[in-house]
Amino acid sequence: MTYLEIEGTNHLSGNVAISGAKNAALPLIVSSILVKNEVKINNVPNVADIKTLISLLENLGAKVNFQNNNALLNTNTLNQTIAKYDIVRKMRASILTLGPLLARFGHCEVSLPGGCAIGQRPIDLHLLALEKMGANIQIKQGYVVASGNLKGNEILFDKITVTGSENIIMAAALAKGKTKLLNVAKEPEVVQLCEVLKDAGLEIKGIGTDELEIYGTDGELLEFKEFSVIPDRIEAGTYLCAGAITNSKITLDKVNATHLSAVLAKLHQMGFETLITEDSITLLPAKEIKPVEIMTSEHPGFPTDMQAQFMALALKANGTSIIDERLFENRFMHVSELLRMGADIKLNGHIATIVGGKELNAADVMATDLRASSALILAALAAKGTSKVHRIYHLDRGYENLEEKFKGLGVKITRLEE
């Protein structure tokens, strides 16, 4: 098992280039199932989750060439509609293949998913929506077994669901007739999926709102143009927090600040200033790091995927911060590890109270999920001494070239074998 050794530091400086968004690339790669031509996708991050998804598509018969952050996908050779447990267990997003496979072939089997151990994350919203579109769904021996010809319908999501929205948008693309989706997720990653489908000729109205109308092609495959994945707003937010926790000036390149409005607003409340251009954000040090109150919610609210990083940052604030996690239960697993470093954090259900301004000390800590592991790295940057972060396979699922990027900012960080 590998781990990261990180030396605490008072200062970062320099530029960091932000990679393509993993959470945008995953549904975009899956959407190639809806397509008759070879698809070229640029700015695809080279992270473990992407490699898992590519191996799943290859297992279904697709031809994929992935190098230099560019993916060439040909799904004309698909000869399988069973997404096997061996691959799906590694990553929850594999469930995204359910809608497109069913829409294209009229039947499929997808193993119930694995991935981050955060809460229950049920997929029943996906299944209920597909049933409303005429699918016959059964759960057999750990697999979702789906069949039927999909027809458009009006579907209201009881809860906002990002992967659920993406799954049903893709299913509706090849369904017969109009599908109206209500309470759709508005995340930038969902918006890009809709825009790519629209560029391919699909009639889709309401992009960027919580109501979509999709006029399905009744089984006729789409033709995609070449496109690039949007920048990763969560990676960008993580590096902004790295600059903030060391109260340093750093610049993010290849970033879209409009996707980070809620994160930037909280940094400004904490006393930091930013200089923003069309594709860069420069973070300027704060005279005093102030405490903050955060409540996670769906986009355009504060993203749950940035909650752990801001908890680490709040440890440096002069006062008491409150974080209210509204989206997932069991998403405070990083707290016990931060306590090992001297953090003063109290939990009451889904609310965390963080008393800042206390010295952090280096420690051996263990990552529990993707975003929690980035919080531990941030805390290690602010701690006195050299910390070791274990189970970093979580980080490799979502952060591209993490050590190289941190080294470029002046961090002493080394990957070692246990």
UniProtKB/Swiss-Prot annotation:
<feature type="modified residue" description="2-(S-cysteinyl)pyruvic acid O-phosphothioketal">
    <location>
        <position position="116"/>
    </location>
</feature>
<dbReference type="InterPro" id="IPR001986">
    <property type="entry name" value="Enolpyruvate_Tfrase_dom"/>
</dbReference>
<feature type="binding site">
    <location>
        <begin position="22"/>
        <end position="23"/>
    </location>
    <ligand>
        <name>phosphoenolpyruvate</name>
    </ligand>
</feature>
<dbReference type="GO" id="GO:0009252">
    <property type="term" value="P:peptidoglycan biosynthetic process"/>
</dbReference>
<dbReference type="GO" id="GO:0051301">
    <property type="term" value="P:cell division"/>
</dbReference>
<dbReference type="InterPro" id="IPR013792">
    <property type="entry name" value="RNA3'P_cycl/enolpyr_Trfase_a/b"/>
</dbReference>
<dbReference type="GO" id="GO:0005737">
    <property type="term" value="C:cytoplasm"/>
</dbReference>
<keyword id="KW-0963">Cytoplasm</keyword>
<comment type="function">
    <text>Cell wall formation. Adds enolpyruvyl to UDP-N-acetylglucosamine.</text>
</comment>
<dbReference type="GO" id="GO:0071555">
    <property type="term" value="P:cell wall organization"/>
</dbReference>
<feature type="active site" description="Proton donor">
    <location>
        <position position="116"/>
    </location>
</feature>
<keyword id="KW-0808">Transferase</keyword>
<protein>
    <recommendedName>
        <fullName>UDP-N-acetylglucosamine 1-carboxyvinyltransferase</fullName>
        <ecNumber>2.5.1.7</ecNumber>
    </recommendedName>
</protein>
<dbReference type="InterPro" id="IPR050068">
    <property type="entry name" value="MurA_subfamily"/>
</dbReference>
<comment type="pathway">
    <text>Cell wall biogenesis; peptidoglycan biosynthesis.</text>
</comment>
<dbReference type="Pfam" id="PF00275">
    <property type="entry name" value="EPSP_synthase"/>
</dbReference>
<dbReference type="InterPro" id="IPR036968">
    <property type="entry name" value="Enolpyruvate_Tfrase_sf"/>
</dbReference>
<keyword id="KW-0131">Cell cycle</keyword>
<feature type="binding site">
    <location>
        <position position="327"/>
    </location>
    <ligand>
        <name>UDP-N-acetyl-alpha-D-glucosamine</name>
    </ligand>
</feature>
<keyword id="KW-0573">Peptidoglycan synthesis</keyword>
<dbReference type="GO" id="GO:0008360">
    <property type="term" value="P:regulation of cell shape"/>
</dbReference>
<dbReference type="GO" id="GO:0008760">
    <property type="term" value="F:UDP-N-acetylglucosamine 1-carboxyvinyltransferase activity"/>
</dbReference>
<feature type="binding site">
    <location>
        <position position="92"/>
    </location>
    <ligand>
        <name>UDP-N-acetyl-alpha-D-glucosamine</name>
    </ligand>
</feature>
<comment type="similarity">
    <text>Belongs to the EPSP synthase family. MurA subfamily.</text>
</comment>
<dbReference type="GO" id="GO:0019277">
    <property type="term" value="P:UDP-N-acetylgalactosamine biosynthetic process"/>
</dbReference>
<feature type="binding site">
    <location>
        <position position="305"/>
    </location>
    <ligand>
        <name>UDP-N-acetyl-alpha-D-glucosamine</name>
    </ligand>
</feature>
<keyword id="KW-0961">Cell wall biogenesis/degradation</keyword>
<dbReference type="InterPro" id="IPR005750">
    <property type="entry name" value="UDP_GlcNAc_COvinyl_MurA"/>
</dbReference>
<keyword id="KW-0133">Cell shape</keyword>
<keyword id="KW-0132">Cell division</keyword>
<keyword id="KW-0670">Pyruvate</keyword>
<feature type="binding site">
    <location>
        <begin position="121"/>
        <end position="125"/>
    </location>
    <ligand>
        <name>UDP-N-acetyl-alpha-D-glucosamine</name>
    </ligand>
</feature>
